[in-house]
Amino acid sequence: MSKKISDLIVTNSLESTDKFLVETEAGTKLAPVASVRTDVYNGVDLTVVFADEIAEYGDPWSWIKARARARNYAGLHVRDYIPWTLDGFTIESEIAGFEPDFECTDQELGGHIDFISRDCYPQYVQWNTSNVNQGNATNAAPYMVSNLKAWYDSKVNSLPTELRNAIISKRSLMETRYTSGQTLQSSTSWAWNDLGKLWAPHESEVFDRSVWSGKYASGNGTKYPAFADGRARLKHFGKGGGRCNWWECDAMDASATHVCYVANYGNAVNNSASNTHIAPVLGFRIG
């Protein structure tokens, strides 16, 4: 005799040999309780899982770019990663989020995937060589004229050609902090800017809010799903290295000298723009 689901007896006791009825892409299946994941998802190497599909494109970056443009994310998950090499160092770039700016920004955006390296590039880079967090007459946005952004720009030509060709620049609403002849403690407005092919994330993209940054620093910042818990905020000084501090792209509010970063404990902090013991992560957008 058939029963309605509402007529079934509720149980709080399951054995490993009991089964769930599940809907999969291949149809309705039975799944044993023992197969249900209870561990934390750490992502998979996409070049292994999709090796056959990638082979049709010749390289993983052409493949993932085609996927993003088609808005085809089947089988892809936040924290899945693609390994590659920069300056002899192994980088594992993981999916931070799918389409965080779809149809947004001042230049309407189509399908895209944002990647952030699982660990830092193993080099300390000053946010600024002088201890200031100001914009200037060329661009009032502090990050846009920072030493950190200049460092990112200097690395673009060292990227693998296939990756460089797959990346699109990231548009972002950036805080502005500049008045000729004055040193400002807080940002006074914002403006759309092109962050380039490599970048550091906003504080709001990591913590979902401004902790040390000001009200103009998170105008279009959406928290990346990869940072849903503290594990992804912990970065290491290169793959296999020790825990390290890493930069964000925001100036600290109520300070003319400090900027925002993530501490080696995973928490939001600030320090001098000229600090020499903070490393960069590698963020980029494929689309």
What are these regions (language model features)?
Residues 2-3, 18, 28, 148, ...:
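Generic cytosolic/nucleocytoplasmic N-terminal low-complexity/intrinsically disordered segments
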